[in-house]
Structures are given as C-alpha cells and as structure tokens.
C-alpha cells in the first residue's frame, strides 16, 4: 500500500492533534471584546481599605507631653514624629547593638521566612511570565505502528513509522481581565508575606532587646537578693546569740529565722527566670543555650529620653501588620474579579510549524512540511453552579478580609495606647521606688553613724540595711520594666513610611519585580536554576 505526501502530512497532523482552522473576527466582535476588556476593572471591588476612625489620641486619656522625671529622666512623647528604624541603638549599649545584629543575621526563623518570601516571589514571576506571554514548546514524535490485516477486503497487514518535529505556540487573550486579576491577587499575597517578614524582623529585634534587658534586670535582682539573704542570715545568727544569753525571746529567734528562710526560698525562682531568659536570648540570636551571651551591665544601659508617637492616621502606613492586612484585602478583591471573569468567554490562539512523515527521507523533504493555525473560543454555560458559588465564596472572603483589616487597625491602636500608658505609669512607679530607696539608704547611713557613736546596737544597722536593700530591689525591678516597655513602644510604632515612587523589592513591590524579563525555561534549566 502506498501513500502520497498529502496523506502522510494529514496523518501526522492527526497524530499530533493539530487541526487547521480558519477563524475570522468580525469587527463588531472585536469592538465588543475591547469594551468588555476595558470594563474588566469593574468585575470586583477596588480593594481600597475601609475608612477607619481617626482618634485625637490613642488612650482613654490623652498622653502627657512627657512622663514624670524618674532617676533624672523625664521621657518626652514626640507626637507626629516618624518611627525610628534602628531604635535599639538609642540605648547607648554597644553590647546590645551587637546582640541585635547577630540575631538579625543568624536567626533560623528569620532565614526561613526570607526563603519562603523568595519562593513566593519566584512563583509570582513564573505565573506572570506564563500568563502574559505566549507559550512555546518543541514537540518530537517517533512512533512505529502496525495495522491488522482484513482479508475480507483484501487489506494486508501494514507496519509503518511516524516521525514529526514541531514548534507549538499558544496564547490566551486576557479579554476579561481574569489573568490580570489572578496575577494581582497573587502579587498581593506575596506582599502579605513581605510585610509579615518585615514584622518578623522587628519582632525579633524587640524580643532580643527585651530578653537582654530582662536577663540583666534579673541578674541585678539576684545579686541584691543574695545580699539580703546574707543580711538575714547574719541577723538570725545574732538573734540566736542573744536568745542564748536571754536577751531575745524565742519568738524573736523564730521570726528572724523565718525571714531568712523566706528570702532564701525566693532565690531559686529568680535564678530559674534568669537562666530561662539567657537560654531564650541565645536561641533568638541563633546560638545554642550553652553559648548564651554574658549579661548586660544594667547600669550602662541608657533610657532613651525621647520616644516617637506616630499620629493615628499615619500608623496605618507604618505598622507591617496593618499593611499586611491591607494587602490581604487587595488580594481578596482581585479574587472576586478573577472569579467573575471566569464566567466569561476565553479566546486562545495556537500555531504550529514543523516537519513530519512516515520515513526520514519524507521528514527532511519539502513534502513533510506541517503547519497549523487555529483559534478556540470557550464560553462556560453550565458547570453545576460551581462558578457562581466560587464568586459568592470570593465575595465572602473579601468581606472577611475587610473585617480583619478593621480589627487589625483597632488592635494596633490598643497596642499603642497600652504602651503609652505603661511608660507613664512605669515612670511614676520608678520615681516612687527611687525615692523609697534613697530614703532607706539615708536611714541606713544615719543608723550606721549612730552605731559608731555607740547610740544604737549593731543589729539596728543591719535591719536598716535590709530595708534599704529591699527598696533597692524594687527600684531595680521598676527600672528594668521601664526599659523593656520603652522597647515595646518603639516596636508598636512600626517602620518609617516608604515613598511608593522609591519603593524597592524589600517591601511590597513584588509585581513589577516578578514581571521583569521572564527567562526561558530551557535557559534556566541549562544554568541549573
């Protein structure tokens, strides 16, 4: 049996499922498609965040211009100032700066978040490249087939080969904006991860500062508690001697012993808190707990004298959690538009060019030339209500994102209000504790001077020193709290707002970066990417 070249080419085209089709667009249809494409932006919500209340001040009461002066520092609340990027440097401690730098460079959690962000950006780049540009594929076919004989019709058994090599090009027009909206939704979700990564960086820095200050505060408390225990034990020994001489009652002895034991019982708990803080700090900066850094000298840490208070309307642009919620809202809005666009027709053009035949001589000759060009139009008609349900689901997701944004803003306002109130109250508590410590120290010094003159017994000096050390313990605790709460306020202020015109890939500018010059898959594979 013989076949001419036209039959050979036809068989190859059928094998590769390419059909020659002519498709002509009427001018009226083109105009309608353009009009619908221009209307694609109205397929869903705009994604603009809802209007939020703009309070005159954050808390139930307006914050003062500054706190009371405690230990010589009255912190000023600078209303309208921008957040400080590297706020931890304001503590004036090189050791603290080094800890934060080490943590930002070595934290496994932060590194994992960064890798996840980069993976999301690459996925966006791939989706934009595959959806906005034509796909080009090389197709090669080499087959050997056998057809059975049909003696009744005089057809003998036939064996033949099919060989073909084609370049296939396809492109789907984004007439109704489905592709654009899907890309916008994915870009917004990538921006969510970018803002979450930014929030993770700031949270890590704040946690390192809080852990370092907490460990230093506990260290100072342990030292002071140790001095109190030594004084209490000495007092108990003195009462024991006086009891043996009959100058002290048994009740006095038991009371002194109970006081010493009570102080001793508090020390293991403080040490456990201190060790836990050191272990936590080591892990935060990427070390094992046995490599925990030495404690800071609490006396060398300077309290920042000024703290920024971003106005409520600007807080929406400085807090990464609010920006992430806004990006989530934009993604949900684009999802509604994409779900709507799926209900409209899609148009795809395809073309192929190559060589084919039943033998290599035919494949390499002009008779083996193959080509196909075609277009397809697909209009959903009945999908069991799936497309309508998907759009309703997208609308509900959008409403949920809208409500989540509102809650995120309200929570941010509450966070700032709590931090401002805490700093004000911390200063008041520290001022009172410092006054108490100074007074107790004065009593101790006077009692000691009177003892040297023989006016009071030694145990009176020891008792006055105990009172001073107890007051000093409270002063240390409140100073540590004030330092930590200051860090929390810096953290609550967020980052300085970024000009969108100069926004780089470090924050929410992933769409343009991902869309830039998609590389060919073959080239990337050749480079091992």
Residue spans of the language-model regions?
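Membrane-embedded beta-strand positions in outer-membrane beta-barrel channels/transporters
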Residues: 100, 164-168, 212, 312, ...
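A short glycine-centered flexible hinge/capping loop motif at secondary-structure junctions
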Residues: 243-247, 451-455, 492-496
């Amino acid at each position: 049996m013989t076949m001419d070249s036209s039959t050979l080419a036809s068989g190859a085209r059928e094998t590769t499922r390419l059909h020659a089709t002519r498709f002509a667009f009427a001018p009226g249809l083109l105009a309608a498609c353009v009009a619908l494409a221009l209307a694609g932006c109205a397929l869903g919500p705009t994604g603009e965040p809802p209007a939020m209340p703009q309070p005159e001040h954050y808390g139930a009461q307006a914050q003062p211009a500054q706190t009371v002066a405690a230990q010589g520092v009255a912190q000023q609340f600078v209303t309208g100032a921008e957040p400080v990027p590297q706020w931890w440097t304001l503590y004036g401690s090189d050791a603290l700066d080094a800890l934060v730098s080490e943590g930002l460079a070595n934290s496994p959690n932060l590194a994992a978040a960064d890798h996840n962000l980069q993976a999301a950006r690459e996925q966006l780049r791939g989706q934009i490249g595959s959806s906005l540009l034509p796909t080009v594929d090389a197709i090669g076919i080499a087959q050997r087939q056998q057809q059975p004989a049909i003696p009744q019709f005089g057809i003998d058994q036939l064996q033949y080969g099919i060989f073909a090599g084609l370049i296939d090009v396809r492109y789907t027009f984004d007439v109704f904006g489905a592709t654009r909206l899907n890309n916008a939704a994915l870009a917004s979700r990538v921006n969510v991860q970018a803002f979450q990564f930014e929030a993770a960086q700031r949270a890590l820095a704040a946690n390192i500062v809080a852990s370092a200050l907490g460990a230093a505060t506990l260290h100072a408390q342990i030292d002071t508690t140790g001095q109190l225990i030594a004084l209490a034990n000495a007092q108990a020994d003195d009462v024991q001697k006086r009891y043996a001489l009959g100058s002290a009652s048994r009740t006095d002895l038991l009371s002194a012993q109970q006081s010493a034991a009570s102080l001793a019982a508090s020390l293991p708990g403080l040490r456990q808190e201190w060790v836990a803080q050191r272990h936590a700090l080591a892990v935060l900066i990427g070390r094992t707990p046995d490599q925990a850094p030495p404690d800071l000298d609490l006396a060398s840490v300077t309290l920042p004298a000024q703290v920024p208070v971003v106005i409520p309307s600007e807080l929406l642009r400085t807090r990464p959690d609010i920006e992430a919620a806004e990006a989530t809202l934009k993604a949900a809005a684009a999802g509604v538009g994409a779900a709507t666009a799926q209900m409209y027709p899609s148009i795809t053009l395809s073309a192929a060019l190559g060589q084919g035949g039943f033998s290599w001589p035919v494949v390499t000759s002009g008779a083996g030339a193959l080509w196909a060009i075609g277009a397809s139009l697909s209009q959903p008609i009945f999908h069991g209500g799936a497309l309508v349900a998907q759009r309703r689901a997208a609308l509900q997701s959008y409403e949920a994102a809208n409500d989540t944004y509102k809650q995120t803003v309200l929570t941010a306002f509450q966070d700032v209000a709590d931090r401002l109130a805490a700093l004000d109250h911390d200063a008041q508590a520290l001022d009172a504790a410092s006054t108490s410590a100074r007074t107790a120290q004065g009593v101790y010094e006077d009692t000691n001077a009177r003892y040297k003159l023989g006016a009071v017994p030694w145990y009176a000096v020891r008792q006055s020193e105990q009172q001073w050390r107890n007051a000093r313990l409270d002063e240390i605790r409140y100073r540590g709290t004030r330092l930590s709460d200051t860090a929390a306020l810096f953290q609550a202020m967020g980052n300085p707002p970024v000009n969108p015109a100069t926004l780089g890939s470090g924050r929410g500018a992933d769409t343009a970066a991902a869309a830039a010059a998609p590389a060919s898959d073959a080239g990337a594979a050749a480079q091992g990417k």
